[in-house]
Amino acid sequence: MIDLSLLPPPDVVETLEFETLYQEVLGIFRAHMGDQWTALLESDPVVKLMEVMAYRELMVRARINAAAKASLLAYAKGADLENRAADYGVQKLTIRPANPDAVPPVEAVMEGDEALRYRTRLSLEALSVAGSSGAYEYHALSSSAELVHVSVDSPRFSGVAVPAAVKAQLPAGAIVVVCDYDAGLANPLPGDVSLAVLARPDSVVPEAQLVATVLKALSAEDVRPVTDRPRVQGGIPSDFQVEAVLWVEAGPDPDVVLAGARASLDKAIAGARRLEGQLPVSAVYAALHVTGISRVDLVKPVEGVVCDKRQYPRATSISLTTKVVT
């Protein structure tokens, strides 16, 4: 799937500079006035009028730029993105429904723009009738707004030659296969599709309920290829601990620096929380080495966290202490 962030800026979006527009207005004015106007002073009322015209032109072109970007999937936001997604037959999911009767009233919590944008792009995969990985991922993500990530895998088998005496006891035309890769499934069979699902961190829906919801959606006759058997499981946490000593430069408040380092680390861990996610030791160092930190002595983890398609990184404890450089 194309990474939208790597696309060049669209030519329809114009680069705007006030001075360029002002010089254009000034050129048009001079072409009409000829030598009859020479009072080119900043304080001249005519100059002020031309500056206003150039500014208004700048605003109009900026509005055109915004409208052009709102029509593109890579840049659209909010209601513009919802309308763009509707062109693909995709609707924004509701995470928490509104409760107007509550005191105070509770607004609905909706799917975020980036999640909707991602599903919209995946929706093209759903047009495949061959059961592509992208199609399974799209249908799984669309089954519940509680999900943030889905991985798709399948077991692999190879044929085995058997002795003639054994073959004679098998049904006519039977073949014998062995499983070379189980894709995390118990007793895998040809045609199995292994899916792992990961819920958002604040989800209150039981994992078993999410698994059942996804399995029901993927088993629909208009979704599942007749030769496939989807099998869904919850993501498996790959637990790790973070323990580090942060050496704070003389001057800054150690508590303030510690809070900044903790926030940076939390962000890095949250970004790695996905199936098949990774959190290298270098990423932990980078997250902790914020402004005001002179050195980081990392005790744990000793090795980076590397997950397979059914695992995701999960920090079970974080211990950060500070020492001031003297």
Q: Can you annotate each of these PLM segments?
A:
Residues 1-130, 135-139, 255-326:
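N-terminal polar alpha-helical/low-complexity "assembly arms" that mediate subunit docking
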Residues 125-275:
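Carbohydrate-recognition loop of C-type lectin domains
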